[in-house]
Amino acid sequence: MSLVKLIEEADERGLAASGLACLDRCLPLLAEETEILRPLWAGVVGGEEDWPARLSASREALDAVGGPAPDVTTALVRTMLGAAPSEWAAGPLRTWADTCSVVALEIHQQLDAVGEDGPAAAAERLARCREDTGAVTDAADGAESTDGIGPLAAGELRRQIAILEILAETAGAAGVRRALDLSTEGQRVLRAVVSRRARAGS
């Protein structure tokens, strides 16, 4: 099933976890402390009762964190959390999860720096991969896909799909725990990329 279809069919828990996972994996671009959002994962488990309060606390925690000089990418990461709905309802959560999916893929594609045909063409490739069930196979090994997205973006696509599948198949806290583990794997990948770039620029 395509990523777009999985988002369309996900329930509130799956949508909240999917959006949060996208944001969580991008945190290394913003802060050295990459467990800031762990309490919000508990909010996903708690659902309607816990989500609003934990979301508010997570925003305050992220605002208090110092990080690299602001740029377009770090602003996007902050905006992802700022746009999260406090209402535990499928409609707003689906809109947020879909936006987070696109933004996270765009960030990973920028770090891949694959192709020289401009941002519009890159966005078109990502949109095609989100709607293409065959993109799952291409992304499975984290290698550059046949649609021209780089290995980082392909790995991010794979994780987004896998997390939504896990949450659809595994109920309760167990599914959220597995989604968090998979997201943490992606976070480590991006943190390594950020570290390499920092060393290269020093």
State where each predicted segment sits.
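Structured binding/interaction patches within domain cores
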Residues: 16-172, 178-181
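General structural signal for secondary-structure boundaries
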Residues: 5-8, 82, 183
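N-terminal leader/propeptide segments of preproteins
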Residues: 1-21
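Low-complexity intrinsically disordered segments
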Residues: 165-202
